[in-house]
Every structure is written in C-alpha cells, then in structure tokens.
C-alpha cells in the first residue's frame, strides 16, 4: 500500500477539494504568481478560489487565493485536474506564506482531511522528493510542529511500511529529524510543558512494558513538551496543566529549563506530544565533568533523589493508573529514594554569628561548641516540627532569602538530628519513615 492510501485510505468520491504542497517550483521574478506541486483530492479547476492553511504554524491566519493555471503530469495544461503530481499556479501566491506542507482547500473540508493532506505533503517532500535531506529553506520555514510531525510520521511509516532492506535508510533520516527538532527547540520564543498539579513541577512521563506476571517494566522518565500550535487542542485530566516556558530575549530560557529538569529534577529526557518522539537527556545537554573533583567542590544536585520524590508525589491517587500499578510504582520509587538518601547532600538554612566554617573533604560542616547558630524550623500539622532541607540551591533560594545561609550536610548529619522536610514536601524521621507533609 502506498503512502497516499496509507494516510487517506481508499479513494472515495469527493465533493470538496484539497491538497498539500509538496514542492515550490521556481518561476520568473517578473510575476507574483506561485507554482506549487501537490496531489489533489477531489477535482480542482482553473478559477477556483481556495483557502490557504498552514497547520503547523503558531500564528498564520488562513487566506484565500485564486488558481490561475493547472498542469497535469500526463496531459499538460488543463482546465481541471485531480490525482498526484499536479502543478498548480496560485495567482499572486508569492504574497502568501506558502511552503511545503501548506494545504490548499475548498470550504467544508474536515480537519481530518486537512491533516491527512498536510502529513502526506511534508512526508512526501522530505522522504521521497528530497531523499531525506532538509534544505536550508526547509530549516527556515518549517515550524517545530512541522518537524515533529515529519519525525513522528516517518517513524510510523518506517515501522509499518519499510522493508528489511531500506529500514536502516529510513532510520538514518529519522535521526536527522530528531537533531533538527532539538536545534529548533532552542530557537523558539516559547514552548508549553505538561506540569503535575500535585507537585507543581514538570510531570515525569513514563513509557513502560509489562512483564509476564503483568507487572510494569518502567522505562526512562521524560518531561513532555507541547508546541504552541497544539496547546488549545491538547486535553489532559485535571491532575495535569500546561504551563508556558519563555525563551526570553537572550534565547536561553528553554535551555535553562532543560538543564533544571534534567540536572535538578532528574528527568531522563524529553518527549514532544507523545512518547513516540523523544530525545534522551544525554543528547540534549552536556553533563558537568565531575571527574576527580573533591566531594566538597561538587555542585549540589540530587537528580536521582528528586526524580523519586516527584514520582511518588505524582503517583499518589492518580486516575491514570490502576491500584496495582500505583502500588508497584510507589514501592519501586520509595526503595530507590531510600538508596538515594544514603549518598545525598542537602542544603540546610542556617543563621550563624560570624563566618561559616569551611566544610571538610566530604562536604560536611561542624561548629565549635561556643558558636551560636539557628537552624530554620517548620511547623507542620499535628504539632510536629521539622528542619527544612533542600536538594539544590535553586529550591533553597526560592524559599530562604536575606539573613539565611546554606549549610551542606548529609541526612543525619550532626547539625540536623531533627526530623526533616525535604524540599518542603517529604517528611523524614528516624526509621526511614517518609510521607507527604500535606
């Protein structure tokens, strides 16, 4: 089955007309007309007025234009045309934002048909007309949504249509698309992220398989990104919400966000729209080189620990999992949390007279008996108190400002013998008992 039927299904009688632009053909600079190549569903006529729609654009509005000429691959100049490889001349088309993937259509075409024409055009352009090579013009014109769709549909096409002989060929093209999406991401003005309402942090999504006994086999945990063009159409249960991440004038906001969710929150990658189109953390950002660095000099980051904290918080009473899976994952990440706590270093809010003593080689700090200091203390429900401790400087600085300093200590260190509250959410006391402070 060819790509056309793969996307559209079997041909049916059409009373409407639509096509996706697969190629822009060069023509004289003396004319404002634009010549494009596409596969027409229905029948298009010279003189027809069509709507120009860019499904992958964040801000393009639909426009109307007139078809001034048609050329059939077999018949030459014609007054009407349908089928594949039709040349369409759009009167004054150069003044519109027409590029590969633009859909020309009549009134009344369904969203599903518009999307099918769009996908057919961009896949055909990339995989077949261009042999899997993105041109400089493509890199400039394609939105991140366009690139993600080509990437996603190429994976689908490769999985269902590729043969053993050409599978490696298509896989190579898919890797190219992933790299282009990664590069495009860092240049955007904004991107939307799926957050967990309960934790207030970017939600960690898990794709998993099931073992023979029916238990889950979880894979890496990823943060889900949504291009702006999809933010209105994506729906999630009430336990999730979309939040905007701005790139800022220096175009470093998204990069900073990625560094935070990977190195501070423990995300193991990102995914766009769904798990199909994902990029691992190693392919996104470069990890700091800690080789040979003294423990005291290492940056305070506890990604494994925070990853477990966030997953325990997310799982809770989520409606997206059954009780058996919730219990299994809760125990899994609680066990991993217990292991991570053994080697974690925390930042403790403290007020002290004079200078803080320098920590030892292990990053631990101790005071002489005559030094006066005050540890921060949190009042919890049930008249309990706990010392707030933090997994990184970002979280510490968000809650404790002037007058407070950060002291580095392991859990159970000499200066924090009390029960502790990790990042304001997890209460911990002797016996490794943990629970949500709320």
For each feature predicted by the language model, list its residue ranges.
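Beta-strand/loop-dominated core regions that host nucleotide or nucleotide-derived cofactor-binding catalytic loops
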Residues: 13-114
């Amino acid at each position: 089955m060819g790509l056309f039927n793969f996307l559209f299904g079997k041909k049916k009688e059409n009373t409407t007309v639509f096509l996706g632009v697969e190629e822009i053909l060069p023509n004289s600079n003396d004319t404002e007309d634009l010549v494009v190549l596409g596969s027409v569903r229905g029948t298009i006529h010279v003189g027809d007025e069509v709507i120009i729609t860019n499904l992958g654009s964040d801000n393009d509005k639909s426009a109307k234009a007139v078809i001034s000429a048609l050329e059939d691959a077999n018949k030459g100049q014609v007054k009407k045309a349908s089928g594949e490889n039709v040349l369409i001349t759009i009167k004054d088309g150069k003044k519109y934002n027409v590029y590969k993937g633009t859909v020309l259509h009549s009134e009344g075409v369904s969203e599903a048909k518009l999307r099918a024409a769009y996908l057919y055009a961009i896949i055909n352009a990339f995989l077949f007309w261009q042999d899997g090579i993105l041109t400089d013009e493509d890199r400039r014109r394609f939105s991140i949504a366009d690139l993600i769709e080509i990437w996603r549909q190429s994976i689908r096409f490769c999985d269902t249509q590729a043969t053993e002989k050409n599978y490696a060929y298509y896989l190579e093209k898919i890797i190219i698309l992933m790299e282009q999406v990664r590069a495009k991401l860092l240049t955007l003005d904004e991107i939307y992220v799926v957050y967990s309402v309960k934790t207030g942090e970017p939600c960690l999504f898990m794709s998993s398989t099931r073992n023979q006994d029916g238990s889950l086999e979880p894979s890496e945990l990823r943060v889900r990104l949504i291009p702006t063009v999809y933010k209105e159409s994506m729906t999630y249960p009430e336990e999730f919400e979309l939040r905007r991440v701005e790139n800022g004038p220096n175009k470093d906001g998204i990069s900073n966000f990625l560094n935070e969710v990977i190195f501070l929150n423990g995300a193991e990658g990102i995914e766009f729209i769904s798990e199909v189109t994902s990029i691992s953390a190693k392919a996104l950002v470069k990890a700091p080189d800690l080789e040979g660095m003294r423990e005291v000099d290492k940056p305070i980051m506890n990604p494994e620990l925070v990853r477990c904290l966030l997953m325990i918080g997310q799982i809770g009473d989520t409606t997206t999992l059954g009780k058996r899976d919730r219990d299994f994952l809760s125990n899994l990440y609680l066990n991993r949390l217990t292991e991570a706590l053994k080697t974690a270093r925390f930042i403790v809010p403290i007020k002290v007279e004079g200078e803080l003593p320098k920590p030892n080689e292990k990053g631990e700090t101790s005071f002489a008996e005559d030094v006066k200091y005050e540890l921060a203390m949190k009042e919890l429900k049930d008249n309990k108190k706990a010392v707030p401790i933090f997994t990184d400087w970002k979280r510490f600085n968000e809650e404790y400002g002037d007058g407070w300093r950060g002291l580095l200590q392991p859990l159970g260190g000499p200066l924090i013998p009390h029960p502790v509250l990790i990042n304001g959410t997890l209460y911990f006391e002797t016996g490794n008992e943990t629970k949500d402070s709320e």
